[in-house]
Amino acid sequence: MSPQTETKASVGFKAGVKEYKLTYYTPEYEVKDTDILAAFRVTPQPGVPPEEAGAAVAAESSTGTWTTVWTDGLTSLDRYKGRCYDIEPVPGEEDQYICYVAYPLDLFEEGSVTNMFTSIVGNVFGFKALRALRLEDLRVPTAYIKTFQGPPHGIQVERDKLNKYGRPLLGCTIKPKLGLSAKNYGRAVYECLRGGLDFTKDDENVNSQPFMRWRDRFLFCAEAIFKSQAETGEIKGHYLNATAGTCEEMIKRAMCARELGVPIVMHDYLTGGFTANTSLAHYCRDNGLLLHIHRAMHAVIDRQKNHGMHFRVLAKALRMSGGDHIHAGTVVGKLEGERDITLGFVDLLRDDFIEKDRSRGIYFTQDWVSMPGVLPVASGGIHVWHMPALTEIFGDDSVLQFGGGTLGHPWGNAPGAVANRVALEACVQARNEGRDLAREGNEIIREASKWSPELAAACEVWKAIKFEFEAMDTL
């Protein structure tokens, strides 16, 4: 190649690394109503300025790459690039910053949580210039929200289907979670539903194992549902876990549930994936099935305070992808969950419009434009003594799920269900009478136990059980 040719080729083009902040840090930018906004907790490597770190996040999660490329000139980067438009230090933390990034809506495929996350939380989380990176919150614009179906049915439709109003719904996870035969499993389902629960549940890892194939479980659980309905006069359900190794097999299991006439199926949405979850949510709406969502694997993503993704983002994504219930922590049980932060994402699941509230970890105002809400499920290490607190914290639009707190009753499964139903009814009545559940909760349970021997026995068994560990999910 002649020197003259080299000179011509280099005119107006200099390959090499340039600072991201020159292109992607734009503090003068005014965000648009159609932008997706993200709040990242950024921990830069030593010597990397926060402006460069924030700009790197914006670049690597949108149009940027490590060097100047010829094809930048073939499109309008100014139209498509992400922009870091604000940076603030994290109070009480050294070298941590909240970096706000705006993404043009054209970067994302309509109706695809999968595509949205592939961009926003894709390769950028392995970027060497950052010691750690956490996505704290997203503002999803109404223009993008309207491209999603959302939950198959929503809270009001579920209440109408079940004919249950004015109280939280009661559930129970069948234990032991693995090892029971299908017939013994169905027996436990029947006893719990007959005792007064609204729902029973497959555990998240109950799929189709050698000791209990899925079709056998579905048949025995359906029999338990219809038998308990006939005896109690109440509509009952069991979360039949349709999660499978392929989307085709998952839909086949959901079709079987529909043909059996049961009201609800279940999916592990993180291990199953958002594409599978959205497909199942569409099937459930088309065929009148409610959809219970388990969040198995969430703590791998959201437990660390400085890296990963907060559960409020996963909760928003689930509402978009589709689900009628989702596990959301308990505040008082064995699983992670600080009260204000938990109630923040519970409101994001249920309400139509949520104002920005940094005290609860909500970084952006979110408008769901009438997308149906999702019932939060409180589950994990809870028992009858927790009932007043759970009723006060979560309110009526929730599912309170007692696994060991039902099946661990000294008299058996049905008395365990009776104890929970009596405790719930007592708390709801006391609240409706104007009593303070937070202050008088234990007294309310003691009063109810005087006329319910099942509740009295449960109170005695679990009177000393506490899970007193400091929550890691703090602001």
UniProtKB/Swiss-Prot annotation:
Cofactor dependency: Mg(2+)
Site (Transition state stabilizer): 334
Reaction equation(s) it catalyzes: 2 (2R)-3-phosphoglycerate + 2 H(+) = D-ribulose 1,5-bisphosphate + CO2 + H2O; D-ribulose 1,5-bisphosphate + O2 = 2-phosphoglycolate + (2R)-3-phosphoglycerate + 2 H(+)
Modified residues (N-acetylproline): 3
Enzyme class, UniProt record, top EC level: lyase
Residue positions, PTM N6,N6,N6-trimethyllysine: 14
Modified positions (N6-carboxylysine) in chain numbering: 201
Cited Gene3D superfamilies: Ribulose bisphosphate carboxylase, large subunit, C-terminal domain, RuBisCO large subunit, N-terminal domain
Cofactor binding, per record: Binds 1 Mg(2+) ion per subunit.
Keywords, in A-Z order: Acetylation, Calvin cycle, Carbon dioxide fixation, Chloroplast, Disulfide bond, Lyase, Magnesium, Metal-binding, Methylation, Monooxygenase, Oxidoreductase, Photorespiration, Photosynthesis, Plastid
Cell compartments where the protein resides: Plastid, Chloroplast
Subunit structure: Heterohexadecamer of 8 large chains and 8 small chains; disulfide-linked. The disulfide link is formed within the large subunit homodimers.
Protein's UniProt name: Ribulose bisphosphate carboxylase large chain
Species this protein is from: Gossypium hirsutum
Lineage: Eukaryota, Viridiplantae, Streptophyta, Embryophyta, Tracheophyta
Gene behind the chain: rbcL
